[in-house]
């Protein structure tokens, strides 16, 4: 597994892979987003009071670390490292280890990596960021289902849930990044 990760990040030739400075900048971005993610729970919970899944329109903030890091350092692995480190940092700031947060972070980072890989890590265009935000939103639904967050949501309500989170992934995660 470690050999696969080393190859993914550039093999033994570090000039092709990630430099230490790039990893450190990525982790710094992740730390900032770990704090933002924890503070954002307040806005999410306030929006939840409105009902009909309006809070999903704020959800895109949790997708931003990967996109911001990639826009600054467009290299393979950056989005995954940023999102994982932000998720891990979020659990540290929360004061408890939270497996679902780590699972979401890894899958969201991978969703962004897939989009960036499709464009061969060469494009920082608005469309690529939009696709990354949307992919990140879409990958979160199976995890929601697995953890039972969608079990009691009626069909029409689930549709709102999906539409609002997808909009948030596109608008908040992309445009604010």
Regions found by a protein language model. Give the residues of each.
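Alpha-helical transmembrane segments and their cytosolic interface
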Residues: 5-28, 35, 161-177
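Alpha-helical transmembrane segments of multipass membrane proteins
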Residues: 29-37, 65-66, 86, 90, ...
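Membrane-helix interface "capping/anchor" motifs
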Residues: 70-81, 118-127
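Alpha-helical transmembrane segments of integral membrane proteins
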Residues: 20-29, 58, 62, 77-82, ...
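Helix-loop junctions at the membrane-solvent interface of multi-pass transporters
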Residues: 39, 92-93, 115-119, 123, ...
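Hydrophobic transmembrane alpha-helices
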Residues: 15-69
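Membrane-embedded alpha-helical hairpins and interfacial helices in multi-pass inner-membrane proteins
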Residues: 51, 122-177
